[in-house]
């Protein structure tokens, strides 16, 4: 009898181990385009269809360009809406949505991976600094979670601008499919108990708005360091200021940077750590300011 009980216990433990090994990858999706954005809702559906455990927490309204801003009001009650199963609309910024996802919805069962996007428009050059999409991913990395920011580019032609970027919206689903294929690749290489991506690093993907046959490949590249400013200001006689768009910023970027390679038809991979540290400049500052 004792042998039978011991055998049953071993089999039960073995079954539990198999279940643990087969536990689906848990993914938290966020964005800055809002909880109705098809770039993220469709990504949730596609990932869930592959068997992943996918949760989405996004701003209730479009928060594009809000960067890393947060709502800091302790005691405030937020009117969170549950839009669908595992999908929440949070009345705040992308960083707020991320925090609510990590420290609210999933606080007892954290995700294996955070994905921000797929964003409507590129996040290269200065746009990466402004981006709520990239900022949410960088915040996740700083917390210690593997994170991907995903965006689709623009074709900078007069026709595209006048018609509100039709190529971007046409190939938006393709960019989501690409992200799913990337998750599949990461998951296939993932060893249980270890991070799914290198610890402390995030990946910003920019996908060109082109048919797959015209995409030239993948190119790892740093974010453009000194981009043309997008915005200017005109000081008016009455003391007010009028914001203007710099026409130079609307021209297709060229050169050896993320904007240039995206515009050449490459999927760009830009790595980031979210640390805001630059210790390699210490010696230069010590020479200027002393120790």
Per-region residue spans from a language model:
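Active-site-proximal beta-strand/loop segments in catalytic clefts of secreted hydrolases
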Residues: 30-33, 57-62, 90-93, 116-120, ...
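Alpha-helix C-terminal capping segments
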Residues: 103-108, 137-146
């Amino acid at each position: 009898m004792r042998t039978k009980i011991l055998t049953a216990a071993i089999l039960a433990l073995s079954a539990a181990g198999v279940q643990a090994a087969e536990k689906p990858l848990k993914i938290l999706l966020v964005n800055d385009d809002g909880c109705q954005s098809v770039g993220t809702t469709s990504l949730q559906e596609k990932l869930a269809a592959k068997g992943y455990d996918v949760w989405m927490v996004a701003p209730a309204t479009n928060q594009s360009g809000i960067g890393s801003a947060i709502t800091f009001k302790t005691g405030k009650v937020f009117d969170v809406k549950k839009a669908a199963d595992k999908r929440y609309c949070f009345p705040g910024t992308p960083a707020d949505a991320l925090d609510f996802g990590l420290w609210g919805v999933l606080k007892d069962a954290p995700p294996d991976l955070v994905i921000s996007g797929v964003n409507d428009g590129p996040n290269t050059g200065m746009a990466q600094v402004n981006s709520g999409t990239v900022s949410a991913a960088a915040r996740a990395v700083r917390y210690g979670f593997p994170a991907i920011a995903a965006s689709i580019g623009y074709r900078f032609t007069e026709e595209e601008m006048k018609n509100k970027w039709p190529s971007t919206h046409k190939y938006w689903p393709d960019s989501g499919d690409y992200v799913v294929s990337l998750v599949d690749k990461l998951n296939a290489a993932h060893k249980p108990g270890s991070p799914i991506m290198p610890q402390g690093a995030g990946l910003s993907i920019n996908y060109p708005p082109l048919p797959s046959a015209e995409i030239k490949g993948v190119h790892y590249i740093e974010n453009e360091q000194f981009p043309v400013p997008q915005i200017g200001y005109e000081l008016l006689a009455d003391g007010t200021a009028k914001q203007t768009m710099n026409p130079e910023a609307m021209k297709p970027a060229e050169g050896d940077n993320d904007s240039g390679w995206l515009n050449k038809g490459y999927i760009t991979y830009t790595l980031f750590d979210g640390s805001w540290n630059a210790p390699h400049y210490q010696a230069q500052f010590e020479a200027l300011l002393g120790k």
